[in-house]
Curated annotation (Swiss-Prot):
This is Sulfur carrier protein FdhD. It is found in: Cytoplasm. Its main location: cytoplasm. GO terms for cellular component: cytoplasm. The active site is at C117. InterPro entries: Cytidine_deaminase-like (IPR016193), FdhD (IPR003786). Belongs to the FdhD family. GO terms for molecular function: sulfur carrier activity; sulfurtransferase activity. Keywords: Cytoplasm, Molybdenum cofactor biosynthesis. The gene is fdhD.
Amino acid sequence: MTNSSSRSVRAGSVVRTVCRHRGGRSAMVQDMVAAEMPVAFIYNGVQFAVMMATPEDLEDFALGFSLSEGIVDHAQDLRVIAVETFLEGASLQIDIPPERAAALDQRRRNLDGRSGCGVCGNESIEAVLRVPPVLNSSLQIDVDALAHALDALHARQPIAAQTGAVHAAGWADAQGNVQLVREDVGRHNALDKLIGALARARIDASQGFAVVTSRASYEMAMKATQARIPLLAAISAPTALAISLADSAGLTLIGFARNHDCVVYSHPQRLNLGVAVGETA
């Protein structure tokens, strides 16, 4: 993968004048709100999708989306990424091998107006509900490592701290040390950006785990599995379909991960709780 150009990269938050009403009083004040704009994914000169996203880390977004959607299998399959931002949006110019572009033509559709998508361009139920290769990672972490990663994730969300309007996705090593965090208005986008950042940094995603500040939908579980991340922990609940996918794909799926509490929905062998299942700590 090579980067061709990146122009006018914007901040993830903007200042707006608002009327704030508190304690029976109102005042006009300056406030920070999350930035959101349409981002067009253009492969070999042809537009594939338009996503509503936070205009930060767009190179990571381009790579992570391409990997998690199965458009390419490896980072090196992306030959050029050009990021162009303008007043009303941004475009990601992405070059992929001709055979990949031909396959993409079968999936092409415009997805304008969505804040993230994990099933983009699929035209059949079978294509959406595909089962990715099974994860065979031997990763094991302690519940303390998970709690440590959750604390670190909370502390590394500058846009969320300013605006309260974005999701975050982070990757931690087996000891719970968070290495990378990405934020976005769309939970799928945040995970895509994280996947792209991992690939750009040449970090082996299978040697750690992901934590997200959202629910764990089917699309989130699919993206984690596509990226070979063996454990996905969400602060909210998973869906039934996400659990089914995780169970069949070998993904450890955790929900309601807060402090030292959590619910493990699939493949619990990767999380050392310090007590045997059925015992009281």
